[in-house]
Each structure stands twice: as structure tokens, then as C-alpha cells.
Swiss-Prot record:
Name listed for the protein in its UniProt record: General alpha-glucoside permease
Keywords of the record: Cell membrane, Glycoprotein, Maltose metabolism, Membrane, Sugar transport, Symport, Transmembrane, Transmembrane helix, Transport
UniProt membrane topology term: Multi-pass membrane protein
Name of encoding gene: MAL11
Taxonomic source organism: Saccharomyces cerevisiae (strain ATCC 204508 / S288c)
Membrane-side (Extracellular) residue stretches: 137-150, 208, 264-278, 392-404, 455-466, 521-532
Role, per record: High-affinity uptake of alpha-glucosides such as maltose, turanose, isomaltose, alpha-methylglucoside, maltotriose, palatinose, trehalose, melezitose and glucose. Acts with the concomitant transport of protons into the cell (symport system).
GO CC, alphabetical: membrane; plasma membrane
Amino acid sequence: MKNIISLVSKKKAASKNEDKNISESSRDIVNQQEVFNTEDFEEGKKDSAFELDHLEFTTNSAQLGDSDEDNENVINEMNATDDANEANSEEKSMTLKQALLKYPKAALWSILVSTTLVMEGYDTALLSALYALPVFQRKFGTLNGEGSYEITSQWQIGLNMCVLCGEMIGLQITTYMVEFMGNRYTMITALGLLTAYIFILYYCKSLAMIAVGQILSAIPWGCFQSLAVTYASEVCPLALRYYMTSYSNICWLFGQIFASGIMKNSQENLGNSDLGYKLPFALQWIWPAPLMIGIFFAPESPWWLVRKDRVAEARKSLSRILSGKGAEKDIQVDLTLKQIELTIEKERLLASKSGSFFNCFKGVNGRRTRLACLTWVAQNSSGAVLLGYSTYFFERAGMATDKAFTFSLIQYCLGLAGTLCSWVISGRVGRWTILTYGLAFQMVCLFIIGGMGFGSGSSASNGAGGLLLALSFFYNAGIGAVVYCIVAEIPSAELRTKTIVLARICYNLMAVINAILTPYMLNVSDWNWGAKTGLYWGGFTAVTLAWVIIDLPETTGRTFSEINELFNQGVPARKFASTVVDPFGKGKTQHDSLADESISQSSSIKQRELNAADKC
């Protein structure tokens, strides 16, 4: 903060003698050029070594001219760059404690918006658990070869496909709604629609009605999937980003724990009543109304407002997000706003300000889109599907129904513990490390589960169940939590929402494959693999781990501006952590840049001479 106050003091002093300072600054900068050799400079110009451009972000320098007005504009741009650098440095050096003291409201607003994902986690776990509920099986199922009722594989696939297709429709609609009305009103609209769609599920008379209710309810869920992560990443500083984006995973787990507890109660107390499946559907009405009220009062993302050229509103939004008061708060708001403006302006210069889906696949953005998509696909290609079918899996592994529901509840609680564990270790190791080690442990668990499928008796089924609990812990301590942060950090600011939408669509496409295959793997009347399913997913996890090691960069400790620069420079994945970048430059004039270039060339020549002398 001392740096901020010092910076503002300097600006105030400069503003009192503005015209005089501009002229003096011009003369001082020109005088400084005597430090480097004019002949080298002229020769460099001939060789096009020093190409003079006007003030652009691609040069990190500005050209001083003969006009005082032009020089004033140049120096204003230099000051803006200094402001952005100051904000970037402040964000990087901020500790978790400092971030919580300075941005407590940002954290709370982020938590509120992400809580919408509780409903999706709840319904995802609910639908899978209903397949194992006796009253639901008798009401909507058919007799199998063993003389018991079950929901056929075809209907399980169909219902799951309805959810995934609805989510993909919702994701596509979300991108256009956000462009038109912003994050807040898009989420409020989605919550209102969800409230109406729940009626279809509550009054369902057939699996076809459930299918209609699921596909319609999934449209708002698609909105929540993309906007919760986007909002959290844009309102919170670097020190809070991992915690607030991975909180999305905690919301999923809260929903799944809630669903498991309700389904356990239904199995024990409402096993022969239609309320056994109606009550779980009805409880979804708890969430929308309070969330709609809370989100209405939430500030809009300042990044979205700047992208829409609504800078004054972005300033107000930042003022609501930041704590403090008086001049100190105003200074911090100005610096942060300038950082956002310059980051977005630089992206627009590089991408010709085109924000279409096609731009997500062009040039540097193509790499960023690929990484975001494959990172989210990795959640579905590493055996996580078994966690969604845990109750059904436990039954097919030989457990009694009541014990299977108990194990599922324990599984989700362990998943919550795993996510909290990832919060602890994220302060010590990077995102990439958390992801790779998490996948490695998952792979081991899955292969052992698959091996136990060749055994028989209660010991084998209990062992497989215990390892599925361990799988839940490692999944949520690793890829389950960290993916939300990585997917939010990888895209550019201009294309963040669209890239996250594309990534989530890819996630859902992989989930479609899982939804088709998994019921066949587990159902007695089909492939009946049981615990052997672990071998299949262990192999997929190994492939996923290999891709992460080779292609996924480390973004820990990087601001959005620095991540942009790393991608623009084409830095290889394994060099992201060690590469030093200067996203905004240092507010230099072109003369400063030429001097630096000359000094750099001179140093390079001297180094070559020393190397030649050493060889001799």
C-alpha cells in the first residue's frame, strides 16, 4: 500500500505543473539517449533491428513527438501502464490473509453465486440413487431375470442423456444471454425457470414425464455450470481464486450429500410410499427463491462491464467488491480498473476485438481452448462416473440396499474432506502438481477395484466399496477441485465465458459416452461387469495422466495478465512456471526501449567475446 500512496503522491505533484513537466520529461528522456552509441542505433535502424511503432501494447513503449499535446497523451499512457503494473504487483504479492481482509465481500458474493451448483449436484446424485430405491423400481421399473424390479439400461441411458442434452442447450443459450444481460440477470432468469420446471418432476406419472422434466431442468443447470466459475474467477483476486473457484466442487458435494441423506431417509421410512421419490424432487424448491434475491443484489463482474465499455459501472462494481474507505480504497479501485482495461485492450488489439466462437479456435486462443476443454473432459475420463453411480455400484458389488446408501453418504463426506484437503495443499504446491498426483492415486484405486471384481464373497465387495471411498477422496482432492480453477484461468478475458462453455460442452459429450456405457457395465441383465469396471476406467485414467504431464501448463501464482503474455509468447507447457514475463511493460518511451535494446546488444556482444576467449 505504501507503493500505491507513493504513486498517487507523485501523480498529484505532477498534475500541478503538467505542461512544464511534459516538456521537461521530453527533454530529460532525449538527454538520456547519450548513454548508447548513435552509430549502433543508426546501423540497427538499417537492419530493421529497431522498428519504430506508435504507442501500441505490442511494443511496450511510446514515441515522444514535437507536440506537447502528443507528449501528454504518451505520458498518460505511460502512467496507465504504471498503474496496471502496480495493480499486477499488488495482486501477486497479496497473501491469503490480506486478500480476505481486502476482498471479504468478493468472497461472499462468489460463494452465493456458486451455491446454485448445489441444485445440480443434488439432482445428479438423486437420479442415480432413485435407480436403487425399491418404490421407484416398482413404480417405473420392469422385472429382470432374477425376479426383482429395476430400471432398464435403456431408460437409465435415456434419462441421463436428457440431462446432458439439456445442459448443453443451456450452455449455448447462456453465452448469448450473458452478452445481452450480464451474469446476474442470466442466473436470475435461470433460477426462475428452474422453479417452474420442478413441478413436472414432482407430478411425474411415467419415465417419459421424468425425461421431459430432466431435460428442461438441465437447461438452467447449464447456465450455473459456466457462470459460477466465471464469476468467481473475475471478482476474486489471485490469492482467493483457487479457493473460490474450487468451492464449486464443494457445492456439488453439498448437493450430493443432501441427496444421499434424503434418499437414505426415503429408503428407510418411505420405502413403500410415493413420497419416497416425490419428496426428494419437491425439496429442490428450497433453493431458487433465496438465491434469486441474493444474486439480484450482487455486483456485476467488473471484467464483463469493461468488456461492454461500461467503465463507470465497472468502477462502482469494484468499489462494492473491495473493502475499505476513503482515498486508499479509491486508489486501489483505480489501479485494479486500469489493470482490467489494459488486459482487455491488449487482447482486443491482438484479436481484432472479435468475440465469436470461431475466435476460440484461432491462433493462441486455439491452444487455450484445447487445454480448457481437455482439462474438463479429464474429470469424466478418470473414473469419476463410478462415484455418480455409487449406490447402484455398491448394490451390484453385493451390498444390501441400506448399506449401499450408507456407503454413498460416507463417500460424499470423504469427497468434501478431499476438497478441503486440496485447499490446504494448494498453498504449498501448484495446480499441475495437485492434478497429476491426484490422477495417479485414482489410477491405482481403480485398478485395484477392478482386480477385486474377480473375487467373490462379502470381503471382495466390501474391499471394492472401501476403495471407491478412497477414490472419492483422491478425486476431490485432485482433479475434482483443481479443474474449476484451471478452466477459469486458461481462457482470455474476452473469450472466457465462451471458452468455459465450450469446455463444459466437451465435458458433457464425454459424459454422454459414460451415460451410454456405464449402465451396461453394471446391470445384471447386460454386461454385468460389477467391480471389474474399475479396470476399464483405470486405463482411461492412465491416458489422461499422460496428457496432463505432457501438455497442461502450470498457472499457479499467475495473474490473468501474465497468463495472457505466456500464451502470446508461445511458452511451452513445462516452462510456464519458470518463465518471467512483463505483461504491461514498464511505462517506457521508445527512446528508453532503444537504449535497453542497445545495452542488451552490447552485453550480448561482450558475452560472445568472453565465450570465444574461454574457448581459446
